[in-house]
């Protein structure tokens, strides 16, 4: 039987330029960003609607994709399209300041929120895994995670190596849509990196897009290349074809200790995202259909081997961190009782940024013209003149990051700056500096938009790790504020049962009405992050709330 989610004939690319295909830019924007998610330059497996992260899809099947496109082209500016796990289920009359699209992906009642139940529904065509930005139509390729990874690695260097990364190297696994950002982020931060992946096409793609510098013939070759780079002080990234569990265990056996150890394989999804040791990709694909339970068991056993190796490398002196793929949880379930002895990256390195509402602010040029991004880069520098670290990031991004699909930029800024930047971009559209509108969004991995006890909300100081009211409040506030589209997802990053999170996108179309919406949404959205962390007792967040005039009734002076 033909899989309705796969079509070899499809090649999707977002329209460029200033000509509308829909009735306004408020509906043209989600149309273009949906299509951009499936651009072959952007998506991991576009012919199967898979954007990134195992099976993170943009639409449930091709019939649903076609219908979403059809509806967006006819949608009026006082109507809202509802999308249920990648399927367009209704159009309702709302008003001009309401979102044009509301999306709910992969949400299950908690008792049933596990991969087994999800996979049953997925097989029946009743659900879709939206990951974070796959099903919410704001994925911009690996750049979307580069700066966050860069910030993490810079923080690692500060905490462990007195700020000096040169002559140090990082071991990691996974070069998919998220993991593929690691080699570039590492070399930008001054580290060398050895990145292991079992899929040769992923290594080739990262080499082609300049995220990865070189490919090694084997582990001996890779280690020799790293030793040479350490001597010369060069920061290089090396891809190695292999199974991460095998390579990590072999390094332990050899007594070779990297300076830093992490992992970004798709361990969150043991059925579709992680290749068991000793298996070929072809055998795994066959077994997923024949005996999915055996695949899950074998994958989790291999993850346990990898985590045991990570713990051994930590014991030998490596700075070891979980990069948010839930591999520790999978190993724990396989009997590795001390799997959580190494920390997640958010509590270890990122949380102080979240306390000030700083997170992965991103925008894309609907014109398709890179010059629009370069002009907005300059505007960011103009409006935030006293942040050399941010300026350095923008300079490196322009020099070293290849655009995938529509030109876009990621730039970590917080409560103080997001609305100012959004209003400035809207003014640039209004006065013709930009050739077409821009969309502003973010990852769901942000300060106020996610509950994920094994990642973003791990080890909250008040113990509120699993409280998921916060992303629900964030989504509702963004709807009330007039965002262009808002999404509520479950299971992104760490898999079914382990996270709830929300996304937001707003269009800068140059109108005065957009000014009002932008001012509300881009203050409120990061404001909920400051609120969430202030409520948990973080002094940085409480001070930020006071400095920025947030009205938090329970916050004591």
UniProtKB/Swiss-Prot annotation:
GO molecular function: urocanate hydratase activity
InterPro entries: Urocanase (IPR055351), Urocanase-like (IPR023637), Urocanase_C (IPR035401), Urocanase_central_sf (IPR038364), Urocanase_CS (IPR023636), Urocanase_N (IPR035400), Urocanase_Rossmann-like (IPR035085), Urocanase_sf (IPR036190)
Cellular component GO terms, alphabetical: cytoplasm
Gene3D superfamilies: Urocanase like domains, Urocanase superfamily
Pfam families recorded: Urocanase, Urocanase_C, Urocanase_N
Recorded coiled-coil stretches: none
Claim: Cell cycle is one of the keywords in the record: no
Active site positions: 411
Pathway the protein contributes to: Amino-acid degradation; L-histidine degradation into L-glutamate; N-formimidoyl-L-glutamate from L-histidine: step 2/3
EC number from the UniProt entry: 4.2.1.49
Co-factor binding comment: Binds 1 NAD(+) per subunit.
UniProt record, GO biological process: L-histidine catabolic process to glutamate and formamide; L-histidine catabolic process to glutamate and formate
Annotated positions binding NAD(+): 53-54, 131, 177-179, 197, 202, 243-244, 264-268, 274-275, 323, 493
Enzyme class, spelled out: lyase
Subcellular location: Cytoplasm
Reaction it catalyzes: 4-imidazolone-5-propanoate = trans-urocanate + H2O
Keyword Plastid: no
Function, in words: Catalyzes the conversion of urocanate to 4-imidazolone-5-propionate.
PANTHER family, alphabetized: UROCANATE HYDRATASE (PTHR12216:SF4)
Family: Belongs to the urocanase family.
Protein name: Urocanate hydratase
Lineage of producing organism: Bacteria, Pseudomonadati, Pseudomonadota, Gammaproteobacteria, Oceanospirillales
Gene from which the chain derives: hutU
């Amino acid at each position: 039987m033909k899989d309705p989610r796969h079509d070899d004939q499809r090649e999707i690319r977002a329209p460029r330029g200033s000509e509308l295909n829909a009735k306004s830019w408020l509906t043209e924007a989600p149309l273009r960003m949906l299509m951009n998610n499936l651009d072959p330059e952007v998506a991991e497996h576009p012919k199967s609607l898979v954007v990134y992260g195992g099976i993170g899809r943009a639409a449930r099947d091709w019939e649903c994709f076609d219908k979403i496109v059809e509806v967006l082209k006819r949608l009026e500016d006082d109507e809202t399209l509802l999308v249920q796990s990648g399927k367009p289920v209704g159009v309702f009359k709302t008003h001009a300041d309401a979102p044009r699209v509301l999306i709910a992906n992969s949400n299950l009642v908690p008792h049933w929120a596990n991969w087994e139940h999800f996979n049953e529904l997925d097989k029946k065509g009743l659900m879709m895994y939206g990951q974070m930005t796959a099903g919410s139509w704001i994925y911009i390729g690996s750049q979307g995670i580069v700066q966050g990874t860069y910030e993490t690695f810079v923080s690692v260097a500060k905490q462990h190596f007195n700020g000096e990364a040169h002559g140090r190297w990082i071991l990691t696994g996974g070069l998919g849509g998220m993991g593929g950002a690691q080699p570039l982020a590492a070399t930008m931060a001054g580290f060398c990196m050895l990145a292991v992946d079992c899929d040769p096409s992923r290594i080739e793609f990262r080499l082609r897009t300049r995220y990865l510098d070189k490919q090694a013939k084997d582990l001996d070759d890779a280690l020799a290349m790293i030793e040479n780079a350490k001597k010369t002080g060069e920061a290089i990234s090396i891809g190695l074809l292999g199974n991460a569990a095998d390579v990590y265990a072999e390094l332990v056996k050899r007594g070779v200790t990297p300076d830093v150890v992490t992992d970004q394989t798709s361990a969150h999804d043991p059925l579709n995202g992680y290749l068991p040791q000793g298996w070929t990709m072809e055998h795994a694909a066959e077994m997923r259909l024949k005996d999915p339970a055996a695949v899950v068991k074998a994958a989790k056993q291999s993850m346990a081997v990898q985590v045991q190796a990570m713990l051994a490398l930590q014991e030998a002196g490596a700075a070891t961190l979980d990069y948010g793929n839930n591999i520790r949880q999978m190993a724990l379930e396989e009997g590795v009782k001390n799997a959580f002895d190494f920390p997640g990256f958010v509590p270890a390195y990122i949380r102080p940024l979240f306390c000030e509402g700083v997170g992965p602010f991103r925008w894309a040029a609907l014109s398709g013209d890179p010059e629009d991004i370069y002009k907005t880069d300059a505007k960011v520098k103009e409006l935030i003149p006293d942040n050399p670290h941010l300026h350095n990031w923008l300079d490196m991004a322009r020099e070293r990051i290849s655009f995938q699909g529509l030109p876009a930029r990621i730039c970590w800024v917080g409560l103080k700056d997001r609305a100012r930047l959004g209003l400035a971009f809207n003014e640039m559209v209004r006065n013709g500096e930009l050739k077409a509108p821009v969309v502003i969004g973010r990852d769901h991995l942000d300060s106020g938009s996610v509950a994920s006890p094994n990642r973003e909300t791990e080890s909250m100081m008040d113990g509120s790790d699993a409280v998921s009211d916060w992303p629900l409040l964030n989504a509702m506030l963004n709807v009330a504020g007039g965002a262009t589209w808002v999404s509520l997802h479950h299971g992104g990053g760490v898999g079914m049962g382990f996270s709830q999170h929300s996304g937001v996108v707003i269009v800068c179309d140059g109108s005065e009405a957009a000014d009002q919406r932008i001012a509300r949404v881009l203050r409120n959205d990061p404001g909920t992050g400051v609120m969430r962390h202030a409520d948990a007792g973080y002094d940085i967040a409480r001070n930020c709330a006071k400095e920025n005039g947030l009205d938090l009734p329970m916050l004591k002076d």
